[in-house]
Structure formats: C-alpha cells, structure tokens
Curated annotation (Swiss-Prot):
Binding positions (acetyl-CoA): V117, R124, Y125, S275, R312, P540
One Gene Ontology term from the biological process aspect of the record: glyoxylate cycle
InterPro entries with a match to the protein in the record: Malate_synth_C_sf, Malate_synth_sf, Malate_synthase_TIM, Malate_synthG, MS_C, MS_N, MS_N_TIM-barrel_dom, MSG_insertion
Record's subunit section: Monomer.
Annotated source species: Geobacillus thermodenitrificans (strain NG80-2)
Full protein name: Malate synthase G
Domain of life of the native organism: Bacteria
Gene name in the database record: glcB
SUPFAM superfamilies given in the database record: Malate synthase G
Amino acid sequence: MIEYVQAGTIQVAKVLYEFVNEELLPNSGLDQDKFWSDFAALIADLTPRNKELLARRDEIQEKLNEWYKEHRGRFDFHEYKAFLTDIGYLEPEVEDFEITTDNVDEEIAVQAGPQLVVPLTNARYALNAANARWGSLYDALYGTDAISEEDGAERGSSYNPVRGAKVIAYGRQFLDEAVPLVEHSHKDAVQYAIVDGKLVVTTEGGATTGLKEPEKLIGFQGEPQNPTAVLLKNNGLHIEIQIDREHPVGKTDKAGIKDIVLEAAVTTIMDGEDSVAAVDAEDKVVVYRNLFGLIKGDLTATFEKNGKRLTRTLNPDREYKTPDGGELVLPGRSLMFVRNVGHLMTNNAILDANGEEVYEGIIDAVVTSLIMKHSLIGNTRYLNSRKGSIYIVKPKMHGSAEVAFANELFDRVEDMLGLERNTIKIGVMDEERRTSLNLKNCIYEVRDRIVFINTGFLDRTGDEIHTSMEAGPMRRKNDMKSSTWLAGYEKSNVAVGLAAGFRGRAQIGKGMWAMPDLMAEMLKQKGAQLKAGANTAWVPSPTAATLHALHYHQVNVAAVQNELANDRNDYRDDILQIPVVDNPQWTADEIQEELDNNCQSILGYVVRWIDQGIGCSKVPDIHNIGLMEDRATLRISSQILANWLHHGICTKEQVLETFKRMAKVVDEQNAGDPNYRPMAPNYDDSVAFQAACDLVFLGYEQPNGYTEPILHRRRQEAKAKFAAVQQ
C-alpha cells in the first residue's frame, strides 16, 4: 500500500513528498507550504479541462466509428472531408504566422545533428546518452557492421590490424570529404601542425598544404607545432583529430592519429514516457531522481563489464586553444530535453481533493520543471541551457485545443515556480492524426515557446489504424511504409514547420532507426531524412549517433531547408488517404505470417515491461534481428491485430494459438536472462501473457489504441503478485 501525506487539499505519496521537500525544494527559491498549496490549486483548476479534452477524444471516435459503418462500401472522399470539418476534426486554418520563440540554445536553433532518446529509469543508459555529445568514429566503425568483415577484417575478440586499417582508411576518406585539403589527401598526411593560426599538413613527400577552407580550423590542444588534438568544424558540427604516436593505434598511423572524434548527439531526450515503465509513485520518483542527478551533474552508475567494476559519470566540458591564441570551451554533454507523458494517464503519486488520482502530465510538468529550474539558478555543476530555458517534449496530443492546454499548463507552472513567461519551451510530437492534419494550428497555440516538431511513424500509424478501425481491414504492418498518408505526413511536417519560421529557430525532427545492430544499412538510408528537410533525427544508441553524424557532414541541412522553404503544398488530402484494403487477397500463409510477426513482437516487449519494468529494450524479432521496441511499436502491432480480428481476417482462436506458440519462441530467446519468467506452458498464470492478449482482444476499446491503460494495470498486478510471493 502507498503511504500518503496530506498537503492542503491533496494527498501526496510519501516517497514523492519527501523527495520534493528534501531534495528539490532546498535552494530552489520556493517556500514549501506555498509550493504544495499552489500545486493543489493548479490541479483543481486544470483537471476539469483535462477531462473535457479526453471526453472530446472519445466523442470524436464514436462519431467516426458510426460514419465509417454507415459508409462502408460507398466511401466518398469529399463527403468524408465535409464530415470531418463538421465534427471539428478538421479545424479552420489560422492565418500565416511565424514562431517568435527566443532564448533557444544553438544546439536546437542552429546546429543540425543526431538526437538520442533514452529511458530515465536506467541511470547508466541516461549517462551514456548525455555523454554521447562526442563519439569515437574509430570505435563506431570498428565495433559495428559499418565496416564489412570481408578479406580478413573480422571483428574477433582481440584487435585485428586488417580491420583497423579499414577503419583508418574510412576515417581519412571522411576527412577528405568534410574538411578537404588544398592539395593532396589526408591519406598522405604525416604531420598536422598549427602555424601562424593556420593548419599546416605535411605529406609523405615533404610537401605542405592546408585546408581548402581555412576557417574550418577552430582550435587545438597541446603545442601548435605538435598538437595532441586538432579541432575542425563542418556544417556546424565539430570534428576532433586526436594525435598520439605512443597510442597502439597512433603508433601504426603515419600521422600519429589515434582517433577521429565526432560531435554527435547534440541533443538528447531524457524520456519519462514511452521508453519507461513507471506505473506508480515509487517508479515516478526513480524517473525524477535520475533526471535531477543529470541536471545537478552528480548522477553516477556503477556496473560490471568484462569482469571489471566501472563507474559512469557525466563528461566535463572540452577545452581548446583557438588559432589566434585565445581559449575555447565546448560542452562535453548533450543538451537535454525531458519528455513528459501526454494528457491521458493518471498516477497514484498524488490524489486530488476528491481522492482521485491526478493526471500524470500535470505532475510531470511541475516536478520536471522544478528539477530543471536548478540549472537556471546556479545550483548545478554544469549548465544544461546556456540561454536560461527549460526544454520539455510533450507527446500524444490530438489537435490544437490539446496543445493550447499544454501551453496553459506551462504558463501556470512558470507562475508557480517563479519563472519568466516562456522559460519552459515545448517540443510537440506530431504523432496523432488530428495533430498532423491541424499542425499549423497546433504550432500557433505555442508559437512563443515551441522549439521542435517531430514525426513518429509508429505511434502515428497506431492512431491511423485506430481512428479508422471501422473503415475496413488495414494494410499489413510493413506495407504501411509505402502508404500515401505516410509520405504526405512526412512532407507536411517539414513544409508546415518551415512555413512557420522554424529555420534557425527550432528543430524539425524525424523518427527512430530501430535496428541498432544494422549500422551499414543505417548509413545507407538515414541520410534521406536530412535530404527531406529534417535538422535532427532519432538514433537508438551513442554508437548510432556517432555514425549518423556522418550524414550531417554529407548533407548541408541549412541549404536543404532553404530550398524546401518555398514548398507551399497542402498535403492534407494525402494524409487523409486511409490505408484500408478494400478486397484483401491475402493467402492463409500471409495472414499467419502477419500474426506470427506481430504476436512475437508484442510478447517480446510486453514480457519485459510487465515482469521486469523495462520500458525500452532491444527485442529480437521472429528472424532474431534486434529491434528497439517501446510503447509506440507495441501500439501499432496490437492495433493491426485488433483491426484484423474486428474485420474477420483472423479469428480469436487463431490469434490465441499464435500467442501461445510465440510465447515459447520468446521464452527461448530470453533463456539467458536470469531474471526472466517464462510464459509457457502456464499461460493463465503469466500476467505478461495475459497483458499481451488484452492488448489485442481489448484493442478495439482502448482509447485511441493506446497501450498504457492495460500495461499500467497489469504491471501493478504483477508487482503486487511478485511482492506477495517474496513475503
């Protein structure tokens, strides 16, 4: 049972109450009693509006369901659009405008670069992500399939000089492309020196040359004639050539280069939403405490690796001498956003005056802003924002009224915490259909505080399926990627953002590369997101961030956005194309293949979520390829099966049989995990297995197809069950 403390009209879980009072409020400039009374007032004032917005979601869904049923077999696009306008689903568009957000850090407004998303429940992962601002290109190439293992270049258990030579050659080729020399190639270099404020490169034949664009030299470490590091800059991102002739790699390199370090994850989203399993007060405090440790700069994580005990901490800033003899300090860490939850869920961390759980998004807004305030008032080892801003990502909003509510919430939090108006900046996830179609209006509601919009294919597909559940059977999951609506959605996000003045002011982001082991493929494909106008895109690991950084050297994002700025196309008719299959011709084998893939994916993710509280993990798919799974991937998998079930493409018995068969596969895939609880053969006794079934068999009724209500309920059940067994 959770122990509560009465704080005015609200009851606060003791674990949260003590954390806030003992750790967050000291040195915050806030009075404890006033903080809690203001919090209670905010809850009382904003809860009714939150409820209204959720009721509006349900009302719209009911109207959609009825319309689709009535028009099945006689769908008329113009009639459909008129209906969506009548019910307020399609909003009248606001006049043209430009955002006016100010005090935005360069990492968001100016620098284009990779963005990491990492669960706040895992301190080690969070530290790794924060430190992924800089990454070793040599390590990223050597340790992944980015460099092939052909011709004796296997990775192996010890250093392979053949592979090392391939890595070095790749690095030199990169330097030739990003920071070319006037004559010769970086491959010919035997020495790098700083002479009269310029980079002088000596080649094997004794000739000297310099940079084709001398201004790309930014700084160095060590002595000018014999630097230990040379700092260059291309397309807004830094490149550090590290030189050490005594180092095992430097010894083998004719110029003594031991590594090329790239500025990589310029920004990171510290996630308290889709990648975490936080279902109660205790879990929420873990999330908040790790965020506070990151902001203060004193978070540590100790772990064992290869038999050694290691402690991870935040990296310090990086110091250089400038070519003209000055000093330069660059951040050693990624600029941090925090992702709050959306408007849907409540949490038992606080009970309101009626004894009801408070909306989790309201709790998140207050507590995470209080945490990040400490960075603004000098209470932390490092600055997060150099511009005095707090960055919050707000997900899963449907239409502009919900974005306006987030704005009102942030206004109230600023007043409560003594922050100037628009100190709290918002990143709006464009991952629900009603937001995609009304994106201009959504941005308008937060035009003074918005710093990012981002497309999320997976959640957005989940909403696509659930919205039009009654329209008919939907395309197979992999076929969704070639849908008309999806191409329109991706183009529209960029076009609307650029038209609203995002260039040089805010991020336009694109989605996750979900296969952390397939880096060669990522290098081939992910550059397309930048060519489409994004100035940031999501990556699953620090290594992926380092490799994705290469794309930003190949593509000048600012130039791409300048070209695309004239795109005034309206993509909404494309976005409205429903991915329904009118006369499905799938064979029995194809249907079973889709069931196998989705059931295995659901079980592989849900079993860790429910039994171990792991909200984001690399889950092997049915072909044993590791895929990064979070609640967004779960939403699409569960909704596609719920849709097929509803339209008779498959039967409940078929799905249940598939779940049972796939449970054995997932059990086998997790056999090496000592904390794993098998689902087979006692399916009725496995809360995780039951949760997976619920997600599909109750998928039709779930609000907007969200997975959180079932996951939270079942995780709480599992926690209680495991605790009872331990007693």
